[in-house]
Amino acid sequence: MHPAHLLVLLGVYVSLLGAARIPPLPLNLIQFSNMIKCTIPGSQPLLDYANYGCYCGPGNNGTPVDDVDRCCQAHDECYDEASNHGCYPELTLYDYYCDTGVPYCKARTQCQVFVCGCDLAVAKCLAGATYNDENKNINTGERCQ
């Protein structure tokens, strides 16, 4: 085998090792994102809301910075309540459909109904809230006390 072929194979191998360490997005997060796209066509929820304010994304403390952040706070609280009822919101998949900008839940189990209801409420809430670019990627240590 030629040395150039070995280098190509080594490159492919290293690339595959790196890709194997990238965790996939939970299916519920993708489903949730699509529900938001139903109420806010053209949005990119995974980018727009990933690090917005004190509650949209991984953080969840302090005083919400605006209505968008209050929507995310309510969603966090709804997921907490679902967890208190024995559900696993981040892992729960459900059926829903979108009709002219309005999502509808078609959930079957109690946990699907609960989680779909949480996602439905925040999707509608975000659609009615004004997005402020200044609240994206804020210093949560300073602003979320």
Swiss-Prot record:
Listed GO MF terms: calcium ion binding; calcium-dependent phospholipase A2 activity; phospholipid binding; toxin activity
Keyword Disulfide bond: yes
InterPro entries assigned to the protein according to its UniProt record, in alphabetical order: PLipase_A2 (IPR001211), PLipase_A2_Asp_AS (IPR033112), PLipase_A2_dom (IPR016090), PLipase_A2_dom_sf (IPR036444), PLipase_A2_His_AS (IPR033113)
Signal peptide limits: 1-19
Protein name per UniProt: Acidic phospholipase A2 homolog textilotoxin C chain
Disulfide bonds: 38-98, 54-144, 56-72, 71-125, 78-118, 87-111, 105-116
Main location: secreted
Pfam families named in the record: Phospholip_A2_1 (PF00068)
Tissue spec. comment: Expressed by the venom gland.
Keyword Protease annotated: no
Location of this chain's protein in the cell: Secreted
Organism the protein comes from: Pseudonaja textilis (Eastern brown snake)
Similarity-based family: Belongs to the phospholipase A2 family. Group I subfamily. D49 sub-subfamily.
Domain of life: Eukaryota
Coiled-coil residue windows: none
Proregion residues excised on maturation: 20-27
Biological process, per Gene Ontology: arachidonate secretion; lipid catabolic process; phospholipid metabolic process
Cellular-component GO terms for this entry: extracellular region
Keywords, comma-separated and alphabetical: Disulfide bond, Neurotoxin, Presynaptic neurotoxin, Secreted, Signal, Toxin
